């Protein structure tokens, strides 16, 4: 855990942290509704796994991610996921071929919401020594996800609890999730409505020994 913590902190400190602030141990916070761009990078090799627009309903725990057409270094369809965390299912949607897969989600944890049990580590400023109005006050949180046996370090803004970046690692994967162009509202709530061709799709059986979760889904794209 110490090696993981050092690696995660090093990443963000290198991004421009200029002054540590006194930490008062803030309570676990909840993300607002959001629309933005999510980029997923595999730190081993620096491969961009996916980048695209998302909508997140923080009240009903629904996430829609649609991969950008600019991410063309792949042979399969662009990823389009609707994740219903409260229901424990997600849909892999292919709008081009009007096909859909419905599968189980085995964990509620994801990169756009602090997982339960996240422990506050430090409060700091990111920005410039000379241009104070450009500084962003942020919190760093760390923890583990029991269902996935993974560890994470998350960077959120103070106040709104906007997730800026999440570093996630297991024995087999190491991913960095970056959140940008964030607007604190769901601009298109219809994104959470299933396409008609998905409505009658049966839940697929999960292969023995396999666990579907937000992090693993993006690792396999």
From Swiss-Prot:
Residue ranges of the TM segments: none
Chief site of localization: secreted
Keywords in alphabetical order: Calcium, Glycoprotein, Secreted, Signal
One GO MF term: calcium ion binding
Tissues where this protein is expressed: EPDs are synthesized in the meninx and secreted in the cerebrospinal fluid.
InterPro entries according to UniProt: Ependymin, Ependymin_CS
PTM comment, free text: Binds calcium through the terminal sialic acids.
GO cellular component terms, A-Z: extracellular region; lysosome
Role of this protein: May play a role in neural plasticity. May be involved during axon regeneration.
The family this protein is said to belong to: Belongs to the ependymin family.
Name under which the protein is recorded: Ependymin-2
Species assigned in the record: Oncorhynchus mykiss
């Amino acid at each position: 855990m110490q090696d993981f913590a050092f690696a995660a902190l090093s990443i963000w400190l290198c991004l421009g942290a200029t002054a540590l602030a006194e930490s008062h141990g803030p309570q676990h916070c909840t993300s607002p509704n959001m629309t933005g761009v999510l980029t997923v990078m595999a730190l081993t090799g620096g491969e961009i796994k996916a980048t695209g627009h998302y909508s997140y309903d923080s009240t009903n725990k629904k996430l829609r991610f649609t991969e950008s057409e600019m991410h063309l270094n792949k042979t399969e369809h662009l990823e389009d996921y609707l994740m219903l965390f409260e229901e424990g299912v997600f849909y892999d949607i292919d709008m081009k071929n009007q096909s859909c897969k419905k599968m189980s989600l085995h964990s509620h944890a994801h990169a756009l919401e602090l997982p339960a049990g996240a422990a506050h580590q430090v409060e700091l400023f990111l920005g410039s020594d000379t241009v104070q109005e450009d500084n962003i006050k942020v919190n760093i949180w760390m923890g583990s996800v029991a269902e996935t046996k993974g560890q994470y370090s998350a960077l959120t803004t103070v106040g709104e609890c906007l997730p800026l970046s999440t570093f996630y690692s297991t024995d087999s994967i190491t991913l960095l999730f970056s959140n940008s162009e964030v607007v604190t509202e769901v601009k298109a709530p219809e994104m959470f409505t299933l396409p008609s061709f998905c409505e009658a799709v049966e839940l697929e059986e999960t292969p023995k020994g396999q666990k579907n979760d937000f992090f693993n889904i993006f690792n396999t794209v």
